[in-house]
Amino acid sequence: MSERKLFTSESVSEGHPDKIADQISDAILDAILAEDPEAHVAAETCVYTGSVHVFGEISTTAYIDINRVVRDTIAEIGYTEAEYGFSAESVGVHPSLVEQSGDIAQGVNEALESREGDTDDLSHIGAGDQGLMFGFAINETPELMPLPISLSHQLVRRLAELRKSGEISYLRPDAKSQVTVEYDEHDKPVRVDTVVISTQHDPEATNNQIRQDVIEKVIKAVIPADYLDDDTKFFINPTGRFVIGGPQGDSGLTGRKIIVDTYGGYSRHGGGAFSGKDATKVDRSASYAARYIAKNLVAAGLATKAEVQLAYAIGVAQPVSVRVDTFGTSTVPEAVLEAAVRQVFDLRPAGIIQMLDLKRPIYKQTAAYGHMGRTDIDLPWERLNKVDALVEAVKTVL
């Protein structure tokens, strides 16, 4: 009897309370970066029935209308009706942003290496905090992501498309998905075992109508037929009713969906959230760099699965550690891959910012449906432009 292994990941829609908060934080970040690319931003958002609180620390020369940014973001998501208990024009907006701590700023603005005489421009910026970050890639999907999180993202994105186009007129913005994939003894995905979808809806929509529409127009439109069989289980709005949703149903906070943002639990996570943070915060920029490295390693054929860990000390430019784990799938020793990575990628914060062009207002688009593995938008850390350099670097190390 072959061994049956299951793995589950989830995603949430742009209308989920925590994702509303993430999108508002990143919309504020983008608005500031559009005027001041050198800004330091840490913007947190809390949403609940009828209210939005924005708080955190910034250092910038920009002036932005936070009230307008918040309302426009909420409207774009789809909260435009008073009956939702949270609507763009009636919500109360309460900003409370203060200047970044001078103690932190002195280590970011001039790294330890620079203070000790290193004149390299890329050694000037220190990491905005200590911490560890992970990046991951696997050859399960064309975008080199784990299949469970890839399908979960596609399901909630499909729900949003059907809602915004009006094809399913009773849908409301809040939704969640969860996909359980069965793997064979070689860790290859063979079928989808279970799909869970909970979607907010107008009160007149019936459970039978929702179930039929979601299975036919969402699940079967997203999941390849080869992965579905008579034993695949569908749980559609299993509570029986989901009219009250969004911030009226649950409060939301920036940074509470870090597993949804990354690899669906398939890879380790350092614990730092992304949204609302400029690229001097290595929680964000180094996580993107680690994904960039892992994806190019797998695309280069140097491994079929790769997890990259980076770690930093606050106010220090160089990472304190770089680790590559290929789970026994690499074509060369992992120490060789680590040496090649250090040759090809400048992993100082300023090096990452330059390499990935991270001073641009590109972040709001990442705040829903995942920061990694996106095929619908052009993100620099998803590009496969380091494959040849890695292959050549491996040869020089060997």
Curated annotation (Swiss-Prot):
GO terms for molecular function: ATP binding; magnesium ion binding; methionine adenosyltransferase activity. Keywords: ATP-binding, Cytoplasm, Magnesium, Metal-binding, Nucleotide-binding, One-carbon metabolism, Potassium, Transferase. ATP binds at residues 16, 174-176, 241-242, 250, 256-257, 273, 277. SUPFAM superfamilies: S-adenosylmethionine synthetase. Residues 100-110 are annotated as: Flexible loop. One of its GO terms (cellular component) is cytoplasm. It comes from Streptococcus pyogenes serotype M6 (strain ATCC BAA-946 / MGAS10394). The keyword Nucleotide-binding applies. Its EC number is 2.5.1.6. This is S-adenosylmethionine synthase. Homotetramer; dimer of dimers. Mg(2+) binds at residue 18. PANTHER family: S-ADENOSYLMETHIONINE SYNTHETASE. L-methionine binds at residues 57, 100, 250, 281. Catalyzes the formation of S-adenosylmethionine (AdoMet) from methionine and ATP. The overall synthetic reaction is composed of two sequential steps, AdoMet formation and the subsequent tripolyphosphate hydrolysis which occurs prior to release of AdoMet from the enzyme. InterPro entries: ADOMET_SYNTHASE_CS, S-AdoMet_synt_C, S-AdoMet_synt_central, S-AdoMet_synt_N, S-AdoMet_synthetase, S-AdoMet_synthetase_sfam. Binds 2 divalent ions per subunit. GO terms for biological process: one-carbon metabolic process; S-adenosylmethionine biosynthetic process. It catalyses: L-methionine + ATP + H2O = S-adenosyl-L-methionine + phosphate + diphosphate. K(+) binds at residue 44. Its cofactor is Mg(2+); K(+).
